Amino acid sequence: MQSPNRDRRYIACFALCIAALILAAPALAQNATFSIFENASGYSARVEVTDAESYQFTQPGYLGEAVPITVREIQVMGVYGNVSYEEQRNSEITFPEGDYLISYVGDLDGNSFSTLFTTPYNVTISLPGGYFLDNPLLGYVSQGGSVQIEENQTIITWEGTRYAEIRFYDEQRLVILYAFGTIWAVFMIILLFGYYSMRAASRD
């Protein structure tokens, strides 16, 4: 038979574990998913928010600050369907406090995408087939990103991040890079050949 003191210790330990789980729950990272369009002209987004009554659509600026952006096809979805919202200044929307999934569509300027959050998020970016990331001169994945290449798309994921960025390219840009590199190499060979020819002539 266990002593009452030991039983009380087990109960206290169990209570502490439950309390820790409850306190840690709000701190768990939420999910945000972005899908780049086939023509890379824009993207669709789905972002979870918890205990929220507003959301601002932003992207990182040159100094890492949050810069408001214009988006369209906004939907705020709750447990029982779509929820009405009001548009405010600086690309912000407001709605009744609660947990929601916010979806929208944004535009891309060039072959790059970046996003910024005020709290940690699990971020997933889906890049369609025909675009690549692996060449360090043309492609880029921000710190913490994990790249998984599938049959018709590339999936990039981050866990618990406030910032995510990718820069991608297509085969045409890769061909241009190789062509430029070849021209530059030929140009350097011609210069070096001329230089050594002049030195040889001066010695004679």
Cite the ranges covered by each PLM segment.
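Lumenal/extracellular ectodomains and adaptor appendage modules
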Residues: A25-D204
